C-alpha cells in the first residue's frame, strides 16, 4: 500500500510539473493593414521578424492559438513595388498564419497574379461576401472556417469591402459583391443555428468607420447584429485602444460586442483571450518594438532569405535625390497641398495644356511621411507606389460641384491652391471657388487628376462622366521623382504650407 501511495505521489508531482494546456481558453492573434512593412518603420516600430517573435511566444504560452491577418498585407513599400507580393505571400507561411482575408490592396496587381500567389499560401482563405465563381480566384476561398478547441467550436467568417469606387474595375472584373450588412449577421446566425458553433467571429475589411458615408462599417454591422460575438476590424487604419471606449459596441440586443484594430504597418499586434466557458473576451495590444530584437535575431534563415530582397530595396532607398525643409505627415494638409500643386506643374508641362484650372488628388494615395532633410528615391517610390497615370478632364461645373460635395462629405481631399471650398458640420458643401471666383455650374473647367479618380475611384463617380483630354503613359510617381530631382538641381527644397483648402465652417 505504501509503495502504491508513493507511485501515485510521483505521478501527481510529474503532472504538476507540466504546464497545463489552456483548453478552456483560445488565444486569437490578429494583425491588419501591414502594407508590406517588412522592416521597422521610420519611428522604429514594426518589422516581420519581431512580429514572428511575438507570435511564437504567444503560441508557446497557449497551444490553443490562432493567427489571423485581416487584409492589406501588401502595398506601401518598395518590397511590393519591386517584387509584386513575392515576399509578403511567402512570409504568410513562414509566420504561420492560420487564416487570412482579402483587403482591397490585394487586388492591386489583378486577380491572375493574386491567384498565383494564393495557391502557394497554406493559410485558410476566407471570404463570405465575395462570389469568385467567374474569376481566377474561384476555388481558393471558403465562406467560413471553424476551429475546434476541446468540445467548443469557434467560427471565423470574412466580410470584404465593396469594390465599387475603391478597386480598379479591371482588377476585379466579374467579382460579385454581396451586401456586407445583409451577409454578416445572416452568416453568424447560420453558423450558430445550423452549424452549431459556440462563437461566431467576424474578420472584417470594411473599416471601423466609413471613408465614404454611404458605405457600411463595422460599428453599423454590430449595431444591427444579434449573433456576432466579436469583430476583428481593419481597413480604416484605426488604432482601437484596449479599454479606451471604442473597443465595445452595443449590438441589436444591447449586448456589448468586443472589436479591435491595430492601426497600420504592423506596429501593434492584437490579442483576444477568449474564455470558452464564459464567453468573456480580453482584448490587448502588444507593441512591436526593439524589445523583441534579440528574439527576432534568432530567425537566421528567414533574415538571410529577406536580405536577398533587401539589397534591391536598399539600392533605391538609399539614393538621395532631394531635400525637404520640414517633416510632413502623409495625412497632413501640408503634404496634400504640395502633391496637388506639384501635380498642376507637372501635368501642365507633360500634357501641353496651359489652361488647367485646378488639380484634384486623393489623399489616400500618399502612403508615407515626408521627412525633414534628405529625401531618397526609395522614399518617393514608397510615397507614391500605385500604378496610376496623370489625366486631364474637361469637367462641366455641375460635375465639379458634385465631386466637391463628395469630398466635403469625407472631410476634404488634396486640391491645388487654385481651388477652395467650405462645408458645414453635416459635411455639406457651402461654397467653392477657383482662383477666387465661385464655381459656375454652367461653365466648363479643365481639371488635372489621376486615372484612379477619373475611373470613379474613391467614389468619384462624377469624374467618370467627363471627357478626357489627356492620359499620360507613365506612372505618376515617376513624374514626381523627376520633379523633385529638378527642384534639387535648381537649388530648391520641398516645402508647403499648412493651409486647409477644403475646410469646415
Language-model features and meaning:
Residues 1-8:
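Bacterial N-terminal signal peptides that target proteins for export
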Residues 9-17:
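Bacterial N-terminal signal peptides
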Residues 22-289, 339-345, 356-359, 390, ...:
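Acidic, metal/ion-coordinating pockets
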Residues 283-296, 435-437:
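Short, solvent-exposed aromatic-acidic interface loops
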Residues 312-334:
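Glycine-rich phosphate/diphosphate-binding loops and the adjacent beta-loop-alpha structural elements
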Residues 25-27, 37-46, 50, 122-129, ...:
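Feature captures C-terminal
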Amino acid at each position: 500500500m505504501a509503495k502504491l501511495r508513493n507511485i501515485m505521489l510521483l505521478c501527481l508531482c510529474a503532472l504538476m510539473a507540466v504546464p497545463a494546456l489552456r483548453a478552456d481558453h483560445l488565444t486569437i492573434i490578429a494583425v491588419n493593414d501591414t502594407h508590406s512593412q517588412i522592416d521597422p518603420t521610420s519611428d522604429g516600430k514594426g518589422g516581420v521578424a519581431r512580429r514572428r517573435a511575438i507570435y511564437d511566444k504567444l503560441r508557446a504560452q497557449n497551444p490553443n492559438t490562432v493567427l489571423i491577418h485581416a487584409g492589406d498585407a501588401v502595398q506601401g513599400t518598395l518590397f511590393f513595388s519591386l517584387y509584386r507580393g513575392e515576399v509578403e505571400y511567402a512570409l504568410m507561411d513562414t509566420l504561420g498564419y492560420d487564416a487570412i482575408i482579402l483587403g482591397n490592396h490585394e487586388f492591386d496587381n489583378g486577380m491572375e497574379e493574386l491567384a498565383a500567389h494564393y495557391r502557394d499560401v497554406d493559410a485558410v482563405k476566407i471570404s463570405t461576401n465575395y462570389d469568385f465563381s467567374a474569376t481566377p480566384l474561384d476555388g481558393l476561398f471558403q465562406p467560413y472556417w471553424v476551429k475546434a478547441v476541446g468540445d467548443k467550436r469557434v467560427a471565423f467568417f470574412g466580410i470584404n469591402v465593396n469594390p465599387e469606387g475603391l478597386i480598379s474595375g479591371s482588377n476585379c472584373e466579374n467579382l460579385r459583391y454581396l451586401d456586407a450588412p445583409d451577409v454578416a449577421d445572416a452568416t453568424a446566425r447560420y453558423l450558430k443555428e445550423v452549424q452549431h458553433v459556440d462563437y461566431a467571429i467576424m474578420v472584417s475589411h470594411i473599416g471601423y468607420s466609413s471613408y465614404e458615408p454611404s458605405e457600411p462599417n463595422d460599428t453599423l454591422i454590430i449595431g444591427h447584429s444579434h449573433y456576432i460575438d466579436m469583430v476583428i476590424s481593419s481597413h480604416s487604419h484605426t488604432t482601437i485602444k484596449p479599454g479606451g471606449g471604442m473597443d465595445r459596441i452595443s449590438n441589436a440586443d444591447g449586448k456589448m460586442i468586443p472589436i479591435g484594430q491595430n492601426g497600420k504597418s504592423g506596429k501593434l499586434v492584437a490579442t483576444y483571450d477568449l474564455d470558452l466557458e464564459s464567453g468573456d473576451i480580453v482584448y490587448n495590444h502588444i507593441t512591436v518594438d526593439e524589445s523583441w530584437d534579440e528574439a527576432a535575431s534568432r530567425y537566421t534563415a528567414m533574415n538571410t532569405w529577406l536580405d536577398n530582397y533587401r539589397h534591391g530595396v536598399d539600392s533605391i532607398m538609399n539614393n538621395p535625390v532631394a531635400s525637404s525643409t520640414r517633416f510632413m505627415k502623409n495625412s497632413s494638409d501640408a503634404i496634400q497641398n504640395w502633391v496637388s500643386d506639384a501635380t498642376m506643374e507637372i501635368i501642365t508641362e507633360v500634357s501641353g495644356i496651359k489652361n488647367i484650372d485646378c488639380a484634384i488628388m486623393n489623399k489616400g494615395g500618399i502612403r508615407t511621411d515626408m521627412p525633414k532633410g534628405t529625401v531618397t528615391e526609395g522614399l518617393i517610390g514608397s510615397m507614391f507606389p500605385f500604378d496610376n497615370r496623370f489625366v486631364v478632364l474637361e469637367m462641366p461645373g455641375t460635375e465639379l460641384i458634385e465631386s466637391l460635395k463628395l469630398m466635403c462629405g469625407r472631410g476634404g481631399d488634396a486640391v491645388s491652391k487654385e481651388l477652395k471650398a467650405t462645408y458645414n458640420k453635416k459635411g455639406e458643401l457651402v461654397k467653392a471657388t477657383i482662383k477666387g471666383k465661385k464655381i459656375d455650374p454652367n461653365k466648363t473647367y479643365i481639371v488635372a487628376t489621376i486615372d484612379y479618380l477619373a475611373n470613379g475611384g474613391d467614389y468619384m463617380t462624377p469624374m467618370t462622366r467627363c471627357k478626357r483630354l489627356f492620359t499620360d503613359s507613365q506612372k505618376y510617381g515617376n513624374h514626381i521623382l523627376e520633379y523633385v530631382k529638378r527642384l534639387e538641381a535648381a537649388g530648391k527644397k520641398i516645402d508647403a504650407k499648412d493651409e486647409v483648402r477644403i475646410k469646415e465652417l
